[in-house]
Amino acid sequence: MRPDPGAQDRRRQGGLHLRIVLEPDFHAVRAALTDALDGLDYLRLSEEERGRLEIVLAEALNNVVEHAAHAGGIELRIAGTGRALRCAVIDDGTPMEGEPPDRTTPPDPFRPGEGGFGCFLIRSLADDVRYVTRAGRNRLSFRIGLGEATLH
């Protein structure tokens, strides 16, 4: 995992910008989650906001490790905008087929194989969820709304 050395400087200059590059394995995902959440400590997120962010980031990053074979590096970006965090998970692995499942359609728990629960959680807990593949790069982006925390 390689945190962006300039991220702290950009945060001090106005706005929040975190960038973490990690290898596609579950231990690196855990470390990246810790680094990302530690980097947001100064926002004093509520327990609910922090938990929601952690679940969505964990699902997104773990989905890349599980499903995007030969993903190479994974890049996590978090930018603060007003009362929200804009997040992006970028990789060059195997693209997802079709659109992520809609939040209004929960997966069938009795269907064999992958159930799509991770995508359903992401859609349920985040806003403005978008997935695109361009020039061999996959990008999942989403927004996490914040209550009292305001980013300047």
Regions found by a protein language model. Give the residues of each.
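Glycine-rich/acidic phosphate-handling loop/turn and adjacent ATP-lid/helix
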Residues: 86-114
